[in-house]
């Protein structure tokens, strides 16, 4: 079964459509009546209760997030304008994240969102990838992400409270590009880089660079996971997300690694399941007191 979620492009859009006709004066009464219908289901069993709880949660979001948007736009107008100046979708999406963080840091405990996802598309560059050309497709996409992230972290730093130290961004793609060129582009790859950004990150390069020598590529032009006894996988995506779950979000490692119900499989020694670094730790320092959740 799927899970339905309420979604809006911008926090300010998180509201119920209002009647703008001659009956607009009834809007408040209509909203109150709908809220009452959802609230009445909270004491009922099964799906009725789930429906009521979901509806009530949606109305709470309608109170919280548009207010968070207004607060940010009022207090941080110049920073908001900076996102617009970039004219980049990624920047404008990160501004919505900044709004929620700022509201929480300003004391609105109703904001309970601690993880966010922002998409940046266009990387399926089978053609016209552009190489090292600053006007090329691939270069432009990376420049967009870089500019947006810089402004976002500068915004957080200016908010105070060490937010630029406490907020962490993981940038990754569900597929990468292969080494062998396909005319003017590249096809889907077997491995790719991830970036972890934030003041709390123990910076550096984790894992070995994959072997990209032409003689060591597979017949399809992809890097290999293994060649004989040599492991080319370098770093497992689970190393990165496992570290974030445990060291930033404070989820007990036993829950993350539980072999039956955990989020990630335990290392059983097999090449296709093991973590590549048992002590993989991106986080600077030992305590979790600086988590954004705190």
Predicted features, each with a name:
Residues 114-117, 168-171, 193-196:
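Structural recognition of the beta-strand scaffold that forms the well-ordered cores
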Residues 109-113, 164-165, 189:
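Short gly/pro-enriched beta-turn/loop segments at secondary-structure junctions
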Residues 173-206:
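Histidine-centered active-site microenvironments of extracellular/periplasmic hydrolases
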Residues 1-146, 154-159, 206-210, 214-294:
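Feature for exported/extracytoplasmic and membrane-associated proteins, marking the mature portion
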Residues 149, 153-183:
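Metal-dependent active-site segment of extracytoplasmic phospho-/sulfohydrolases and closely related
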């Amino acid at each position: 079964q799927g899970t339905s979620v309420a979604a809006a492009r911008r926090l300010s859009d998180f509201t119920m459509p209002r009647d703008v006709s001659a009956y607009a004066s009834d809007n408040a009464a209509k909203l109150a009546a709908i809220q009452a219908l959802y609230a009445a289901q909270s004491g009922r069993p099964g799906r009725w209760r789930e429906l009521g709880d979901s509806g009530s949660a949606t109305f709470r979001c309608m109170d919280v997030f548009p207010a968070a948007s207004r607060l940010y736009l009022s207090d941080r107008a110049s920073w908001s304008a900076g996102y617009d100046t970039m004219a980049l979708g990624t920047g404008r999406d990160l501004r919505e994240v900044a709004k929620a963080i700022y509201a929480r840091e300003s004391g609105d405990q109703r904001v309970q969102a601690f993880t966010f996802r922002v998409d940046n598309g266009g990387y399926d560059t089978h053609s016209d990838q552009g190489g090292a050309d600053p006007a090329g497709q691939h270069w432009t996409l990376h420049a967009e992400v870089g500019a947006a992230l810089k402004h976002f972290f500068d915004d957080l730093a200016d908010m105070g409270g060490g937010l630029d130290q406490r907020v962490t961004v993981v940038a990754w793609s569900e597929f990468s590009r292969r080494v062998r060129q396909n005319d003017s582009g590249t096809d889907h790859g077997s491995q790719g880089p991830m970036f972890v950004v934030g003041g709390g990150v123990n910076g550096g390069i984790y894992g070995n660079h994959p072997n990209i020598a032409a003689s060591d590529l597979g017949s399809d032009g992809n890097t290999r996971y293994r060649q004989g006894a040599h492991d080319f996988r370098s770093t497992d995506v689970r190393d990165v997300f496992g570290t974030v779950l445990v060291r930033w979000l404070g989820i007990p490692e036993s829950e993350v690694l539980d072999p039956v119900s955990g989020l990630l499989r335990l290392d059983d020694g097999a090449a296709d399941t093991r973590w590549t670094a048992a002590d993989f730790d991106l986080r600077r320092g030992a305590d979790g007191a600086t988590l954004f959740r705190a």
